[in-house]
Amino acid sequence: MIRHAKPEDADSCIHLMKLVKNDFPGYREDAFRTALQEMIERGEAFVSQDDDMLEGMVGFSREKKALTMLAVHPDCRREGIATRLIYTVAGCFEPEDEISVITFAENDPRGEAARACYRSCGFEAEEDLEISNVECQKLV
């Protein structure tokens, strides 16, 4: 079930991020915790939960029209959770809005799964970036 994230989800989201932090260039727990709390307060975070297990989470910015984080539990990957979370966020925008996301650069194998997922949802490469000394790619 996908729903808006609540303040009491923060610890589960932190635990999930610890499992997948290597998938996020420049991840820092303190900065993530602060950003997560702000997104929850603004209604800009969703979680996918099955019984007591947090399967995935997504955060976004209405102002920037961007997905800012998307994480799926390693045991729940390839089940369509990321796609459902992306489409849930897309439903928060107007159809003509262009939503962006940043992931690892095209030549970085750490971003292969994420890029495939984003592309299956209609995202296309727009520009190459560097974040925290890591080559990345912006998709829209």
Please identify what each model-predicted range represents.
Residues 93-107:
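Conserved GNAT acetyl-CoA-binding A-motif
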Residues 132-136:
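Short acidic/glycine-enriched loop/turn segments that link adjacent beta-strands
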Residues 4-69, 73-75, 86-87, 92:
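Acetyl-CoA-dependent GNAT
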Residues 83, 106-128:
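Conserved active-site alpha-helix within GNAT-family acetyltransferase domains
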